[in-house]
Amino acid sequence: MDNNEREKFWNVLKNLHNNDEASMNMLTEASHKPKTLCRFRPVSEHSLQQLQENKLFFSSADHYDDPFDTYFYIDVDQMVPVYEEMRKDLLEGNTEFADKLRQIAKLTGQEPETFVNTLSNGALDFAQLKGQLTMVHNSIQRRLFSICFCEDPYNETLWLKYANNYSGFVQIYDLSCPETFMCGTETACLNCISANERPYTYPVYYSDMRYDATKYALGIWLMEKIEKLNNMALASLHEYVKFSLIWEIERISLIKKKCHEYDQEWRMIRPAMFEQRSCVKMKPSKVIVGLRTPQYERRLIASAATIAGIQEIYELYINNLDKLDSRPITI
């Protein structure tokens, strides 16, 4: 998928407002799903165990190597016109909206009627809210879980960055094979979120312009306050806020700085919004061992892949055309 196609996908994503069938079809059509996805790994105890068990773990954005991952900003100043629109609703007698605001006032430690009356009759001081929303930035990154892939197993940038300078390996997943995605096929899957809510995989968009995540930050700020209170009476408000943030997780997760565009990344995004790490079970169709992987680690990779039931175990080499290629491994 080239950069122009990624931009077209992004333009569709940022203009979605619901998750009905028509919206999903538009997004699927724009994403141009590849036939295969690749996952680059260094050699470690964890990566070998996950290879052996056909597991891929989601990671939160605050643990990624790029400190600018989830390339967004929070603009509290833009809340002023939103605030004015809220005042307008109150002055026009929208009682349902007023009740929601009273619930929000309780969450923020303010007297509900005073809050609503102040909102109706005059300006508010946004300084405190600005400080709190700025702190939400790290909380947002902790809530965004994804697994990173690319299309090309010979991507030189990723062999350097994520496979320890050609000393690791790459797992290749055939998306056309029904046996690739294993979640939901075992007894242990009955209560697993990955089996009940199958994650979607989307292309990453690269840009020098950050995404405006102010709405999402405000929503997360409210939801965190509701969760801390653990009050069932506020459950409907929690769901109301959560639904209002539809597609915001995808928009924030799928934008990175332009300088990373050679990664040509795809991301599997976990649909639920909780700070709990989970995994999916996916069986690679092929594993390629790195060009500089030490002999004893080559044996460990081949052994783990064999236990996982992976038939094609290959090694990376440079062919006669001076390009990266792969061939069956010799141990």
Model-derived features with residue positions:
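Partner-binding and oligomerization surfaces adjacent to conserved cores of proteins
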Residues: M1-I331
